[in-house]
Amino acid sequence: MSEKNAYAKSGVDVEAGYEVVERIKKHVARTERAGVMGALGGFGGMFDLSKTGVREPVLVSGTDGVGTKLMLAIKYDKHDTIGQDCVAMCVNDIIAAGAEPLYFLDYVATGKNNPVKFEEVVSGVAEGCVQAGAALIGGETAEMPGMYGEDDYDLAGFAVGVAEKSQLIDGSKVKEGDILLGLASSGIHSNGYSLVRRVFADYTGKELLPELEGKQLKDVLLEPTRIYVRAALPLIKEELVNGIGHITGGGFIENVPRMFADDLAAEIDEDKVPVLPIFKALEKYGDIKHEEMFEIFNMGVGLMLAVSPENVNRVKELLDEPVYEIGRIIKKADDSVVIK
């Protein structure tokens, strides 16, 4: 018995792995940017930091996955956008620290390598990288029979960005009286899907719920996470924002306080939050308490900015989209987030 046949009999298809690499090359090429060194397939991805032109560079890194949203991608056999979700979860975190994404690496683990499916996954990763301005400089596809079912896979990503030391955003500049501006989310994004799947467990995904304005349920549930790099980066370069919050797992209650010091709080005007139809549907069909919705989901705001009052008009001018003035920073009395 040859070694190759022995490995194949154990459930690992080496040839399928090679095919994945060949299929994804054209997608990786789309993400090329200044600073990338070497070619795809090396032992390590390389990047020349001097090409960024940053005088006092601070590297900022982030890693994340997309949770059980993957289970819906598998259920509905739609894999071409889940990669964008993975990129978004990572780059939105580092943009919140004031960093411009430079490069990205992905990791896919599966029970059986399916070259067509994983080309779709990586095409989504590449699309996310293009939107973020990050190069896809490396990755890994691990075939692990026995660990995962044949149709199952997991996806994680790793982003590295750079910031001028003087432009880092760490919450220290946020002050009482700052205005809280919200940028719209594209949907649920990539958090809370264990609850989402429970609520819609008996649905096929083809339903046209009245709350969803003519869209099929599965399309709304798999809407890719918005990437905020292009919107936020010009504001960071002009030093117009004092704090940035990426509203992910834990919703408003967990993420907004990460924007500022412990002696401050956020006062949110609920009437000004652009709640998306899917959240109204989740609250209704899941019988979820209204206040709990803000503890789980982004509720229609995926990125929150703390801005000095005198800079609000300039921020709105630079952002070519609706901007929601949803609250302000106050002195903390009890709770870190007060929703009125």
From Swiss-Prot:
Pathway: Purine metabolism; IMP biosynthesis via de novo pathway; 5-amino-1-(5-phospho-D-ribosyl)imidazole from N(2)-formyl-N(1)-(5-phospho-D-ribosyl)glycinamide: step 2/2. Its EC number is 6.3.3.1. The keyword Magnesium does not apply. It catalyses: 2-formamido-N(1)-(5-O-phospho-beta-D-ribosyl)acetamidine + ATP = 5-amino-1-(5-phospho-beta-D-ribosyl)imidazole + ADP + phosphate + H(+). GO terms for molecular function: ATP binding; phosphoribosylamine-glycine ligase activity; phosphoribosylformylglycinamidine cyclo-ligase activity. It is an enzyme of class 6 (ligase). InterPro entries: PurM-like_C_dom (IPR010918), PurM-like_C_sf (IPR036676), PurM-like_N (IPR016188), PurM-like_N_sf (IPR036921), PurM_cligase (IPR004733). Keywords: ATP-binding, Cytoplasm, Ligase, Nucleotide-binding, Purine biosynthesis. Transmembrane segments: none annotated. It is found in: Cytoplasm. One of its GO terms (biological process) is 'de novo' IMP biosynthetic process. One of its GO terms (cellular component) is cytosol. PANTHER family: TRIFUNCTIONAL PURINE BIOSYNTHETIC PROTEIN ADENOSINE-3 (PTHR10520:SF12), TRIFUNCTIONAL PURINE BIOSYNTHETIC PROTEIN ADENOSINE-3-RELATED (PTHR10520). Belongs to the AIR synthase family. This is Phosphoribosylformylglycinamidine cyclo-ligase. It comes from Streptococcus pyogenes serotype M12 (strain MGAS2096). The lineage of its organism: Bacteria, Bacillati, Bacillota, Bacilli, Lactobacillales. The gene is purM.
